Amino acid sequence: SLEKYADQVPVREHEWDNRHFWRVSNAEQLEMSADCGIINLSHFHMTDISGPDHVALLEWLCAAKIGGDANIGKGIYTHFLDDEGNVRADFTIFRLADRCRLVNGADAGPRDLNYMRRVAQDRGLDVTITDVTEDFTTIGIWGPNARTKLQEVVEDPAALEKDAFPFAAIRQVRIAGRDVSAFRISYVGEQGWELHMPYADGLAVWDALRSTGVIAVGVETYANSRRLEKSLRLQNADLRTEYNLLEADLARPKVKEADFRGKAKHLEYRAREHQPAMLCTLVMTDNIDSSGIARYPVGILPVLDPDTGEVLVDELGRRSYTSSIAYGPTIGRNIALAYLPWSHAREGRKLVLEYMGETFPAEVAAVGYKPLYDPENLKPRS
């Protein structure tokens, strides 16, 4: 892939910016976007919540509606809020007939599992909460040809057709003689599925997918570069308890009827004329440093006002730093997410990022959730 896309993937000349296989990762992303790729997602943490009160527990903890027969067989992206209505966690819940499976990141998973256990105990709920991470593994398959490639290896190819398999649905398929739960979703902005299966079946399914000629794509594309081109938020980076769900622009159009933790504060925030800050997408408009070297920043960068040279501070005293940053090879820019004060959260607003003692011009490309790549989100639903 690197040979194929060498002219589209920058060479990072500065030693600090080049401490990773960035060019390989970027080339993999471009190939996935042009054709198809599979990604090892075995780092997912999984928790099963069952028992008579399992829906009641999750209805209380989650901002999204979990109950109701209409949600059975669906994947629900949702959040835990704290009592202040700020974002404590994000994850996907698979609403199964007799239980819910919470699919989480490896870092936040154990934390959220123990939190659920404590809340269930405090509220006297009859639930069983089990860590099933070691029992299952996940493979992502994405790209414009994901359906075609997956149809080569499933027993019932017609079941994958667009009308038969709606976006966000979960269906059982068979690959290489193994039962697989296919979840039609995308964190990389392309058509495709998460494939969930027993851990012991992972290698057989992986080999079957590879036999179609698809490339294996590293997790950098999933976790950073394409994620930022899609304006997707990362827990413990962009989603933190210092900011609320509206500032992260992840609030649903309507608030569910059922009570949930943080609901009162969430309603209070919704009634505001505007939020104190908004999570915005920034692009660096010039990345050449004083030595004439193009920089590709990593880490956390202060966001400055170009007129004063001072770090931006919102009305609650929160300072603006990049919460995520990566080079997006499809867009061809360094892209960052950062919470900006309402006064500065305007598309086209000129800002400055500080990196290693130097300043680089940037501008606000989007306020709130607004992808730079495929802004209408047509590709994942294709």
Q: Language-model segments: which ranges?
A:
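Conserved, structured C-terminal
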Residues: 1-4, 9-20, 26, 96-382
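Acidic, proline/glycine-enriched N-terminal capping motif
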Residues: 1-78, 86
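Membrane-targeting and insertion segments and their boundary/processing signals
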Residues: 28-32, 83, 90, 176-183
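Short, well-ordered loop/turn elements at secondary-structure boundaries
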Residues: 33, 42-43, 88, 95-98, ...
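Internal amphipathic helical hairpin motif
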Residues: 52-87, 144-178
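Well-ordered mid-protein domain cores that form the structural environment of catalytic cofactors
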Residues: 60-122
